[in-house]
């Protein structure tokens, strides 16, 4: 837990992605980002790990931080916040600094804060559902938030987004993003069916099934026998492995087996996936 304690702030419950800024992805390169913020995706996955490991107090600190950070209009949901819940994180380049190993620019803030990333809602919905599954400190406001988030998602789930990789170019219809839309709706449906909570379950179930059918049709390349990074493409990426982890498809499904083989062939180097 020492690493988690280092990256978390006891006073707020927020968990930062990293305590550093502008460390380069490659020496001398320009992909030097500021990661001293709380990404909802990263923190949601951390919450699940904390619950599974039995660190319920730490998990509840983050859940409470989440509820405070995203309070208000669900349309204003951001993919990241400051550790204190700050929303304004403008990206600024500090030209007077030399950068680590000459890697420029040095950045403060992160421009991805304004991106649309559909998958984040899936991870948040799954994380809050996990707290319910573990029967840890149930909170009626968490469900009210989930209902509001899903209601907003229904209005724009079919729009292209920047995806889990935070692409700074043209938004795409990313397969992983759409699968995580399914996750968000599925967890909402479960809240009603398995826990007796109130919600528009018929509408949620209808759109959930619609999204899944679309992903299986448009996010899958019949000729190659794999899911693809985005609709109309042929490349695979590592995020597709999460389709199994979140229950979108079984790991032994032939479509997933083909995807795994392609990822191993195209993206694996020395046992690591790029």
Segments and roles (model prediction):
Residues 1-274:
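Acidic, mature catalytic/reactive cores of soluble proteins
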């Amino acid at each position: 837990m020492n690493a988690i304690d280092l990256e978390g702030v006891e006073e707020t419950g927020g968990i930062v992605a990293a305590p550093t800024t502008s460390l380069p992805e490659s020496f001398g390169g320009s992909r030097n980002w500021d990661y001293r913020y709380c990404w909802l995706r990263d923190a949601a996955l951390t919450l699940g790990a904390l619950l599974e490991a039995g660190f319920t107090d730490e998990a509840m600190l983050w859940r409470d931080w989440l509820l405070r950070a995203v309070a208000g209009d669900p349309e204003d949901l951001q993919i990241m916040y400051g550790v204190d819940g700050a929303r304004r994180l403008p990206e600024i380049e500090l030209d007077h600094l030399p950068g680590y190993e000459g890697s420029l620019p040095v950045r403060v803030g992160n421009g991805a804060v304004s991106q649309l990333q559909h998958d984040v809602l899936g991870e948040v919905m799954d994380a809050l559902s996990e707290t319910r599954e573990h029967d840890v400190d149930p909170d009626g406001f968490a469900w009210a938030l989930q209902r509001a988030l899903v209601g907003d998602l229904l209005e724009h789930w079919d729009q292209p987004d920047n995806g889990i990789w935070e692409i700074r170019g043209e938004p795409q219809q990313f397969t992983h993003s759409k699968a995580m839309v399914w996750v968000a709706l599925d967890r909402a449906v479960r809240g009603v069916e398995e826990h007796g909570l109130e919600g528009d379950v018929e509408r949620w179930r209808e759109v959930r099934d619609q999204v899944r059918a679309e992903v299986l049709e448009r996010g899958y390349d019949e000729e190659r026998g794999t899911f693809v990074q985005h609709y109309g493409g042929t490349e695979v990426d590592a995020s597709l492995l999460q389709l199994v982890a979140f229950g979108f498809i079984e790991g032994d499904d032939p479509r997933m087996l083909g995807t795994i083989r392609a990822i191993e062939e195209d993206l694996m180097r020395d046992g690591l996936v790029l």
